[in-house]
């Protein structure tokens, strides 16, 4: 899987605007449309480009609070880790979940409309879970 400077520039342009046309991309890369399309297709087939997404404006959607919360589990056995990750996937407030090393097991990126909604989520969901020892 070799990525040359043209691929890197193409990827940068797609990260800025995933809706950019192949024609506009080709112009910016100083190549014709066919090789540009082939490069995009190859990068998708290799899994380098996994998907194209829309980046949403949280505030315009009324989701103004972002919190990074650290979590310790009651036990860190494989089954507990799987159960915790499955539980977290069911909550749209949690945008990202990362495994940590050190004193915390996970860090969560939580987005809510306001502080009260965040507090309710912590109290009624996270703190209520038998899987979580400490927040």
PLM features per residue range, with description:
Residues 1-135:
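A compositional/biophysical signature of low hydrophobicity enriched in polar/charged and small residues
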């Amino acid at each position: 899987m070799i990525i040359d400077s043209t691929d890197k520039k193409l990827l940068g342009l797609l990260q800025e605007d995933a809706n950019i046309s192949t024609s506009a991309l080709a112009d910016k890369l100083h190549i014709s449309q066919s090789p540009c399309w082939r490069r995009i297709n190859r990068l998708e087939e290799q899994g380098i480009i996994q998907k194209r997404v829309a980046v949403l404006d949280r505030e315009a959607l009324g989701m103004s609070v972002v919190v990074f919360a650290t979590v310790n589990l009651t036990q860190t056995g494989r089954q507990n880790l799987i159960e915790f990750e499955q539980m977290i996937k069911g909550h749209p407030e949690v945008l990202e979940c990362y495994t940590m090393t050190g004193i915390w097991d996970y860090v969560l990126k939580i987005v809510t409309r306001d502080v009260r909604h965040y507090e309710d989520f912590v109290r009624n969901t996270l703190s209520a879970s038998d899987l979580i020892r400490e927040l």
